[in-house]
From Swiss-Prot:
The gene is pheS. Its cofactor is Mg(2+). It holds the Pfam family Phe_tRNA-synt_N. It comes from Desulfitobacterium hafniense (strain DSM 10664 / DCB-2). This is Phenylalanine--tRNA ligase alpha subunit. Tetramer of two alpha and two beta subunits. PANTHER family: PHENYLALANINE--TRNA LIGASE, MITOCHONDRIAL, PHENYLALANYL-TRNA SYNTHETASE. It is found in: Cytoplasm.
């Protein structure tokens, strides 16, 4: 029986040298070491041996198996290397041929504007904060000084999921969540970019649009600080020659409140069809944070003050690039998008 095992070993080693493909190598392995292989069959003969002979014969078979498996590994490496060299030889590339350029992608104008806004405010020391788009009525309205049945709620048509859950109508809830999380640390200095949802759909409105809101809370924050920040932003976004003006307005979460206009990019303030002859274009809303909002965020309104502002990214993009219809930003028309 030992002679038979040695014969299988010698024949198999000889056949290994004749094998020329990985497929044939695998077939030979199954033929010898598989469940019905010739070497495996030798193990079944152990039942006819005496108890003294069995361990000796088993050791011979196992040693032979180890020798063959090592030989298989070496031969497999040789064949794999040969196959790779053959493939490289057959698949040579003619590098003298002219290359074929792939279509180049374009960054969406909204993405470009959002990243530019973030870059500007990060340079001023603000941090980026984010929050959920599906929001509770408390964070979206009540914590922002808009209790239930407040008349100002009619300013926004909201998408409610349940009586207490809705798609956020602004990114302001992130400000409350950040104040709650950060208190009592100062300063709070964040911008909140994100998607918001309102029931509007026309040339200048979309049911889903993007906002960037900002918040700063600390000791001694004044309206002049707000104006300085927004003036710097406007000049970095629209050009160094831009001026801004603040017009009195009303927002439930700020007091005093102001709409912010920038001098017209087209006429420089002389008056044209874009600015409707006024020389000014509205870009965002702002104001000093209402004391109640500070209290809802966990800060002492007698010791601290703050300012907030918010802008629609689509409006900023339309003004920056001269886009007249907001819906173009969402139509996925490559003729339009490839211009940016």
């Amino acid at each position: 029986m030992k002679q038979e095992v040695h014969r299988i070993q010698e024949e198999t080693l000889a056949e290994l040298q004749q094998v020329s493909t990985l497929e044939a190598l695998q077939e030979l392995k199954v033929k010898v070491l598989g469940k019905k292989g010739s070497l495996t069959a030798q193990l079944r003969k152990m039942g006819g041996l005496s108890p003294e002979e069995r361990p000796i014969f088993g050791q011979v078979v196992n040693e032979t198996r180890d020798i063959l498996e090592a030989a298989w590994v070496r031969r497999e490496e040789e064949l794999s290397q040969a196959a790779m060299l053959k493939q490289l030889e057959e698949e040579k590339l003619d590098i003298s041929l002219p290359g074929v350029s792939l279509p180049r992608g374009h960054q969406h104008p909204l993405t470009k504007v959002i990243e530019e806004i973030e870059e500007i405010f990060l340079g001023m020391g603000f941090q980026i904060a984010e929050g959920p788009e599906i929001e509770s009525d408390y964070y979206n309205f009540e914590a922002l000084n808009l209790p239930k049945d407040h008349p100002a709620r009619e300013m926004q048509d909201s998408f409610y999921i349940t009586e207490e859950i809705l798609l956020r109508t602004q990114t302001s809830p992130v400000q409350i969540r950040t104040m709650e999380k950060q208190r009592p640390q100062l300063p709070v200095k964040i911008i909140c970019p994100g998607k918001v949802y309102r029931n509007d759909d026309d040339a200048t409105h979309s049911p889903m649009f993007h906002q960037v809101e900002g918040l700063m809370v600390d000791r001694g924050i004044r309206m002049s600080d707000l104006k300085g920040i927004l003036l710097s932003f406007s000049r970095m976004m629209f050009g160094e020659s831009r001026e801004i003006r603040l017009r009195p307005s009303f927002f439930p979460f700020t007091e005093p409140s102001a709409e912010v206009d920038v001098s017209c990019m087209l006429c420089g303030g002389a008056g044209c069809r874009i600015c409707k002859g006024t020389g000014w274009i509205e870009i965002l809303g702002s104001g000093m944070v209402h004391p109640r909002v500070l209290e809802m965020g966990g800060y002492d309104s007698k010791e601290l003050t703050g300012f907030a502002f918010g802008m629609g990214v689509e409006r900023i993009a339309m003004l920056k690039y001269g886009i007249e219809d907001m819906r173009l930003l969402f139509d996925n028309d490559l003729r339009f998008l490839q211009q940016f």
